[in-house]
Amino acid sequence: MKSYLQSKLLSWFPRLNSQVWILATGRFLSEVGTGFTLFYAPIFFAKGVGLSATEVGLGLGSASISGVLGRIIGGSFSDSQFWGRRRTLLLSAAISAIASFALAATNNFFTFVLANLLAGFGIGLYWPATEAAVADLTEGQVRQEAYAVVRLADNLGLGLGIILGGILISSTGNYRTLFIIDGISFIVFFGVVYLAIAETNKGNGETSSTTRKNRGFLPNSWQTALSDRLLLVFVVINIIFTTYISQLHSTLGLYFSSRFSSQIISILFSWHMVLAILTMIPVSRFFKRFNHPQALMISALLWGIGFSLIWFIGGVPNFQLIWAILGMGILAIATVSYTPSAAAFVADIAPVTLRGVYLSINSLCWAIGYAIGPPLGGWAMDQSPGLTNSFWLVLAFSVSGLIAILQYLNHIFRRYNQTQERR
């Protein structure tokens, strides 16, 4: 009986290259440290250091600017023969550790901005390198599950870090310790990559046959990527999806605050996170039966249903909490159905020698979506109650346009696959 239960438990986990599991473990440890500081940084720097709310906002926002630069450089570094995936990950961990220790020592606005610039740059380097490494270590339908495992490690580490950070603050009140722990977690991640991760970029150093001749200021690899119609159509789709996701992290809390108590809001977001963690691997496994554009169409439908349920909170006065619970649950599944499929799609269409650049562009879509989403949602929340509530209905209806673009993507993706099969 015991061996049967063990075999059933092991069968739940996908069979992946051990390097993927090691990378996910390192990321879990790193995200525990990030969770320590995620919600407490604005509080500490406003109340503990004495920065104004505007200064805190500017400082935290500067990380997004350097993050864009980090993603661009990270993509090029990941594809280079000198840096590769492994060295780029090591550089990311080292810079992130320095940034965390700098934040722990911050006493003024200048060092606060400098530390955030470093932090954003370090995280920007991370995403193209790690997603390219996962693509190198997997192929076919397994790749989608591998991305789900890495995202699961992110969510588990972040959730545990938030809980432990809250316990530490409530017992000691020492905010600077949180940033020191964050820095140590990046050092641990550095050690895991250095000792246990081999370079996965097996390119021969030659220019890809798909790479265009340089006819402008952009590097050849970026010109090639930005001339790929499949990728460009997906960029539009990806920006829309990330704009949706940004509403969960910025606008939804504001919308709930006028309808529910802070305790209820905390429970709703905890329910959302727990369900996302529990369904990440089962959902990615279920979606293996579809191609990537089809999986993203299902995800889009779930986003539309989720936003409609959020609209019911204000549009249908009765059972507000029930609508909120259902809406947050559907949006959790919508999120986990999107992230692995999106990354796996980009990895599948990218030439092997350009995976870092392609996945860098995929990561940049998140930066653009998060630049659009919060201001848009904030503007909607400042309007009259009727318009504020209608915002969620507009988002739900926008899904029809997204599905139309996804149908076009599916059409050209099928043609792409037919061309690849003839070669």
PLM segments and residue spans:
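Helix-to-loop junctions at the C-terminal end of transmembrane segments
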Residues: G70-W83, T279-H292, M381
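A membrane-interface helix-boundary motif in multi-pass transporters
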Residues: S170-I184, W379-S400
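C-terminal ends and interior cores of transmembrane alpha-helices
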Residues: A94-N107, L302-N318
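C-terminal membrane-cytosol helix-exit motif in multi-pass small-molecule transporters
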Residues: S185-E206, I405-N410
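Juxtamembrane intracellular "pre-TM" segments in multi-pass secondary transporters
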Residues: M1-N17, T200-V236
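Cytoplasmic helix-loop-helix junction between adjacent transmembrane helices
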Residues: L117-L156
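Helix-loop boundary and gating motifs at the non-cytosolic
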Residues: F13-S64, L230-L268
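Conserved MFS/SLC helix-loop-helix module at the cytosolic interface between two early adjacent transmembrane helices
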Residues: G70-T106
